[in-house]
Amino acid sequence: MERYVFDYRKLNGRIGEVFGSQKEYAKALGVSDSTVSKKLSNKAYFSQKEIEKTVDILGINPGSITAYFFTM
C-alpha cells in the first residue's frame, strides 16, 4: 500500500505565527511534541479530530483546510 506524503510547510508556518513553537502548539492540541513532530514529518497522520482542533486553535478558515493538510 502506497503511503501519501503531504506538504505541511503552510501549516508549520501558521503554527509558528500563532504559537511561536511546535512545543506550544502540541500543548494546545493536547499531544506530545514528538507526536506533532511525527505528524509534520509524515511518519504519522493527523486524525479528523486533530485537524478540527487545529483549525480552531490556529484560526484557519475551514475553506482552506486542504491547503494546510492535504497538499502533496
Language-model-detected regions and their locations in the chain:
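DNA-binding alpha-helical recognition surfaces that contact promoter or target DNA
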Residues: 13, 38, 67
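Short alpha-helical DNA-recognition segment
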Residues: 19-38
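DNA major-groove recognition helix of helix-turn-helix/homeodomain DNA-binding modules
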Residues: 49-65
